[in-house]
């Protein structure tokens, strides 16, 4: 067990040598075989992110409030002061760390599923982009791995392009979690932040938006390819205002990572979810994956199903500071058609039957 802990500490530090040497020194016990240790490191890498996303912010808030009531109150006071002074940083592009984005832990995260990033066209560093990510899934695991880390080599595949994965603004009001998210280049998904990145941050920026949002997450389930997009047009308007090209992305396998109880429209369960989404900002989902010890037991570890994220052809968008509804409708329809073609082109290559269709709601 000490050997496993030592190995994982090397993963968190982003070093590979300590991990490899530790694994080679393992005794010849079946559950301590090299492949078993690597698999457990992959599970731990995924689980730490899931738990960070779900409870890190709340847990750190509670800890800091507790510390504030002890003799160590100065530590909490200094951090909260720092938060106040640094409050607007997430809304101005954040504070990314190449070191964090290249941690070895993300490569183990990638290999757990595994996650793959497919490039179909070159992107020009002289342009800005809005990436539309579909489907949302429960936690956008493919989006995080591909665009919030360097595990799949996004910066090498698209040289000169800096990706900004957008997520709920409320996450950046949580102590420690905000620092963790910003280190990966993650930013709040609100109009002010997107406007700043696309207008005051030079060129070569790509804002990655899970367009379907919380509403789409309520409908995701394995084997279903449905995206909430027909009435989502705000991202198209922003793209027109800044002349940012639109890039459709479909992540095959994103909906296969968790199973959830889907409440039908009009049911009491869906009513509660929608009210929660309206007033809190996100929708609570009743979902489960597998446990740490067995894929046959329920838990928070996502199912190890492949996620292949295909980045489509950019749609050239002109800059129109005051776009009309007709302008928005035109480029929205172009985006729908492009996403549909992308899905149809790759579905059979990635294991779906030719009869499978992409549904827009």
Swiss-Prot record:
Catalytic activity as recorded in UniProt: an acyl-CoA + a 1,2-diacyl-sn-glycerol = a triacyl-sn-glycerol + CoA; all-trans-retinol + an acyl-CoA = an all-trans-retinyl ester + CoA; 2-(9Z-octadecenoyl)-glycerol + (9Z)-octadecenoyl-CoA = 1,2-di-(9Z-octadecenoyl)-sn-glycerol + CoA; 1,2-di-(9Z-octadecenoyl)-sn-glycerol + (9Z)-octadecenoyl-CoA = 1,2,3-tri-(9Z-octadecenoyl)-glycerol + CoA
Name of the protein this chain belongs to: Diacylglycerol O-acyltransferase 2
CDD domains, alphabetized: LPLAT_MGAT-like
Gene Ontology annotations of biological process type: diacylglycerol biosynthetic process; diacylglycerol metabolic process; glycerol metabolic process; monoacylglycerol biosynthetic process; triglyceride biosynthetic process
GO annotations of cellular component type: endoplasmic reticulum membrane; lipid droplet; perinuclear endoplasmic reticulum membrane
InterPro entries found in the cross-reference section: DAGAT
Top-rank taxon, per record: Eukaryota
Record localization: Endoplasmic reticulum membrane; Lipid droplet; Cytoplasm, Perinuclear region
Cytoplasmic side: 1-42, 86-361
Membrane topology: Multi-pass membrane protein
Keywords, alphabetical: Acyltransferase, Cytoplasm, Endoplasmic reticulum, Glycerol metabolism, Lipid biosynthesis, Lipid droplet, Lipid metabolism, Membrane, Transferase, Transmembrane, Transmembrane helix
GO MF, any single term: retinol O-fatty-acyltransferase activity
Residue ranges that the UniProt entry lists as topological domain Lumenal: 62-65
Described function: Essential acyltransferase that catalyzes the terminal and only committed step in triacylglycerol synthesis by using diacylglycerol and fatty acyl CoA as substrates. Required for synthesis and storage of intracellular triglycerides. Probably plays a central role in cytosolic lipid accumulation.
PANTHER family: DIACYLGLYCEROL O-ACYLTRANSFERASE, DIACYLGLYCEROL O-ACYLTRANSFERASE 2
